[in-house]
Amino acid sequence: GKAIALGLAERGFDLVLNDIAAQAGVLEETAAEARAHGNRVIALLADVSAKVQVQAMIAEAVAQMGAIHAVVNNAGILRASDVEHCPEDYWDSVMDVNAKGTFLVVQAVLPVMKAQGYGRICNIASIGGKHGAPEQAHYSASKAAVMGFTRVLAQEVGPLGITANCICPGIILTDMGRVNLDDPAISNAWKARTAMARIGAPEDVVGPVAFFCSDDSAFVTGQTLNVDGGIVLS
């Protein structure tokens, strides 16, 4: 999320950044870095899995910024467990943030974009939604849901001047992914499966996100773009 925020700021986007209350410090640090590019940047706390909080966040964003031209749904969590022993709360929490959170943000922002006659929606899924891994069934299901949701959404909002697209990052060295990738054996195994023979950096996702959030993608909708260094080829 931070790399996307700073990358969009570098490209001239004004930003509304969001995170949960527990990450307030990190959120404000990111906002401060983004403002250094001369952009207008605000930071709003909200849990995307809570409808009331999402609606309040969107209302505040419109009140402060006047419009919402693009949305990037990037919130996500991962809690590892095999299917047989997966606690119900693991399943629920992952689905709530990854899938329902995307839905709730889109649902809240659509009236704004419809009134504008313009909007760009970029949902972040994962290559895990296409090629699952052991102990990630609930994560894989949540990201597959995001892809399916995006395809239907694109059909519904296309006539309104709104596009909806999806990005599937591969193995990226984020804070969430670092837990496993710090193990050289695991990291090297993923590199061996990737055509470009390296682990992705968060900055690798920025360009595709910027494309889907701009008029460069004006006639592109309902698409899922793999940003994975070629891991789908393995």
Sequence positions of predicted segments:
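Short-chain dehydrogenase/reductase
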Residues: 1-65, 70, 79, 89-90
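Short C-terminal tail/terminal secondary-structure segment
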Residues: 130-134, 210, 221-234
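Residue(s) in the substrate-gating loop at a strand-loop-helix junction
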Residues: 126
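Active-site helix of classical SDR
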Residues: 106, 142, 150
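Alpha-helical segment proximal to the catalytic Tyr-Lys
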Residues: 111, 155-159, 218
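Substrate-binding pocket helix/loop in short-chain dehydrogenase/reductase
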Residues: 82-83, 87-92, 186, 190
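Active-site loop immediately N-terminal to the catalytic Tyr-X3-Lys motif
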Residues: 81-84, 131-137, 159-160, 197, ...
